[in-house]
């Protein structure tokens, strides 16, 4: 009798653990993406109209991927005029600013690439919020627009 009771308690727990894949749900990832859109629009730096923040894709549409999966994608651009700054100085400043915003304000873990440190043609920033199922990539350009940002959810079952 005791074995039956133990089995009745342990079986649902074992099923719950085995059925959870460890990845976030599509709904949770999509909600976190929308929070990032709001964070970007209300960010102290990027809400300056001179930076010309443009949300090109809001991340509110399901895009089919994989077998029965979906993802959402947010794309945005912003610009900071270079004025008389040297290209390298402009890129250094813009890269540091975007890395700080993504890591400190948005909570992304960034993969730093020291090999592109003095690249005059632009810089790439990659990162993720693993627990939220989000990946970020940003391109820092010497030409307008300075920042090209993309955040997307992993391909998850809806």
Residue ranges and their predicted role:
Residues 1-8:
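Bacterial N-terminal signal peptides that target proteins for export
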Residues 2, 14-72, 80, 92:
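N-terminal leader/targeting segments
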Residues 6, 18-21, 25, 42, ...:
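Generic serine detector
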Residues 29, 154-158:
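C-terminal basic regulatory modules in eukaryotic proteins
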Residues 70-82, 147-153:
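Oligomerization/assembly interface segments of phage tail-like spikes and tubes
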Residues 85-154:
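Extracytosolic low-complexity repeat regions of secreted or lipid-anchored proteins
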